[in-house]
Each structure stands twice: as structure tokens, then as C-alpha cells.
Amino acid sequence: MGRSKCFMDISIGGELEGRIVIELYDDVVPKTAENFRLLCTGEKGLGPNTGVPLHYKGNRFHRVIKGFMIQGGDISANDGTGGESIYGLKFDDENFELKHERKGMLSMANSGPNTNGSQFFITTTRTSHLDGKHVVFGRVTKGMGVVRSIEHVSIEEQSCPSQDVVIHDCGEIPEGADDGICDFFKDGDVYPDWPIDLNESPAELSWWMETVDFVKAHGNEHFKKQDYKMALRKYRKALRYLDICWEKEGIDEETSTALRKTKSQIFTNSAACKLKFGDAKGALLDTEFAMRDEDNNVKALFRQGQAYMALNNVDAAAESLEKALQFEPNDAGIKKEYAAVMKKIAFRDNEEKKQYRKMFV
């Protein structure tokens, strides 16, 4: 029998983020690993000491320190002051054989020797100074990208995330069963959100380019359905896969041009999503990225004009739209947006003239 595996599905700010898959070292620290496994399945019922379910589901990550770790598992207080193990409030340190030798190590949080409960943390870097003080009992095998997403959530006082980072669901993965990483959102996108989570990493450049197009197309479908958040997620994912393309052999000038054009299109589509959210600054940044790889990207210029308009920078908006019209002088959408910008500029100029006249009355 192999080592036990568990999963945690994470939501950030109420939006499902992805799955973390954890391998437990039940051959080295069986008691500690079993505590975590049963807290994932929730099969032990209510805790006799706290009266709350001995279950991580619905629990949140209450402490996040960038460049160090993310911490959760306080099933009773949800703030780092509580918790309960399946053995009672606390149980002893099992051993310190395993080390905090790299990112993704799963370890018990405590308040001193022999004070293990339900709280745990996942390292985001090597943390050797914790060796001999905290019991390591597992490691993240897939979903480190989700861990990074948690790590980069903005924080408030006492390293508490400003958004709720919640264990939406959790449990055990039976031996030999699918880990649920692929097609996590059940929309037909069969590839994991993060390339590092692929079971096999193909060497062929063509595979990666086809996958980028596949994921981008899923983003476009979500955009058409007005599911802009999921569309944006797909565009970000497509960019992650596109980044891997540059590591592969066989990139000639034609392929390089095609990759840059695709990257420009993805950033343009991402900008469109952000405009729908009202994130004009984010959209503007994406259009700048888009035009680094394709300076004659008409759609990027159009989105840039829209972003400037939303930021009330009408002069910059007019400049972007004028450039777009140079490439597509008959485009009805660009002409309509440009007319609206010019109307706003005319109104502003007229108001300024009125103010000047008042000054000299």
C-alpha cells in the first residue's frame, strides 16, 4: 500500500480557486498523518472538547506570511487560538525525522512542545529553522500554484488575509483514484490549471502550442457566456502554458511570431474581461503587455482607449483610438467609441472656456 493522499479545494473571496493534493507520510509519522487524514474526511464527528465537527471543511486559512508559509486548521475558533485533534485537545510530538527542506512541506502548528491539535501550515520556501520544533507529516504533490495564490492574497493585521481563504471541500483520495486536478471546473478543459501539475510534461512544442489555443478557446467561450471571471482565469492559464513554449526546441522565426501574436491576443482578451469588472487600471496594463508583442494590435488599441476613457483620461483615449482607426478606419465599434471620446473632450473644452470668461468679467 502506498502513502495516503488527501485533497483540499480552496476558495478565495468566495470564488473557487483550485485543488491542493497532499501526500501524507503515514509510514514515518502515522499518528500525525492519521489525525490530518480524518480531519479531512470528517468521519470522527463532533469533538468532545470543543463541540465542533472534527472536519476541515469550511475552515479558513487564518495566517499568511509571504515567503514563509500559509496556516489553517483552527476548526473551533478560526483565528489561530483554537483547534482540536482526533485524540483530544492536544497530542504529543511524534518525531522530528522529516525536515522542512523545501516549499510545499506540510507541518503541525503548535504553541510549544507536545501541543499539536488540528492546526497545520504549508511552507512556501525552505524553513530549516523549524526543524526539531514542528512535526512534518506530508507534502504538496499538486496544487502548489493554489498555495502561491493564497500566499499572495493581501493581508491585514496579524498576517490575516483580507479575503476569506476557505477550505471549500476536503477528503481522502482512494489509492489509484483520479486526483481531480484535471477538468477541476467541469467545463471540458481537461488540462490542470498549472503546467507543473501535469502527470507527464510533453517535449513537443506543437503539443504546448495546441494546448495554449485549446485553453484560450475555452476562455473565449466563457467570455461569450458573460462569465468574465472564468474567462480571465482561462486566459491566465493559457499564458502559463505559453510561457513553457519558449523552453522547447524548434522555435524558428515564424513560430516565434505566432507565439507573440497569440500572447498579444490573450492579453487583449484579458483586458476586455477586466473592463467588464471595472478594473480599468488592470485592463490598461494588459493592453500595454499586448502591444509589446504586437504594436499594431487594433483590438488592444481599442481596449486601451476604453480603459483610458474609464479612467477619465480622454486625451489619451483619443490618441489610442486614433491609432486604432489608422489600421481599421471603417470599424464601427472604434468609430463609435472615438465619437463618444471627442464629445467628452468638446464638452470639457467648452466648460473650460466658460470658466475663463468668468475670470475676466
Curated annotation (Swiss-Prot):
Phenotype upon loss of function = Plants lacking both CRC and CYP40/SQN exhibit strong floral meristem (FM) indeterminacy with reiterations of extra floral whorls in the center of the flower associated with reduced AGAMOUS and SUPERMAN levels.
Q: Give the activity regulation note.
A: Binds cyclosporin A (CsA). CsA mediates some of its effects via an inhibitory action on PPIase.
Single GO MF descriptor: peptidyl-prolyl cis-trans isomerase activity
Sequence ranges of the TPR repeats = 212-245, 298-331
From which domain of life does this come? Eukaryota
Task: Please give the catalytic activity noted in the UniProt record.
Answer: [protein]-peptidylproline (omega=180) = [protein]-peptidylproline (omega=0)
Q: Does the keyword Amino-acid biosynthesis apply?
A: no
Q: Name one Pfam family in it.
A: Pro_isomerase
Per the record, what is one GO cellular component?
A: cytoplasm
Hydrolase keyword on record: no
- Write out the entry's keywords from A to Z: Chaperone, Cytoplasm, Isomerase, Repeat, Rotamase, TPR repeat
**Tissue expression from the record:** Expressed at low levels in seedlings, roots, shoots, leaves, stems, inflorescences, flowers and siliques, with highest levels dividing tissues.
Q: Where in the cell is it found?
A: Cytoplasm
Q: Name one GO biological process term.
A: floral meristem determinacy
* Transmembrane parts of this sequence: none
Q: What is its EC number?
A: 5.2.1.8
Residue ranges constituting the PPIase cyclophilin-type domain according to the UniProt record:
7-172
Q: Any idea what job this protein has? A: PPIases accelerate the folding of proteins. It catalyzes the cis-trans isomerization of proline imidic peptide bonds in oligopeptides. Involved in promoting the expression of the juvenile phase of vegetative development, and, to a lower extent, in regulating the positioning of floral buds, floral morphogenesis and the expression of HSPs. Collaboratively with RBL and ULT1, influences floral meristem (FM) determinacy in an AGAMOUS and SUPERMAN-dependent manner, thus contributing to the floral developmental homeostasis.
By sequence similarity, the record places it as follows:
Belongs to the cyclophilin-type PPIase family.
Which protein are we looking at? Peptidyl-prolyl cis-trans isomerase CYP40
Q: What gene codes for this chain?
A: CYP40
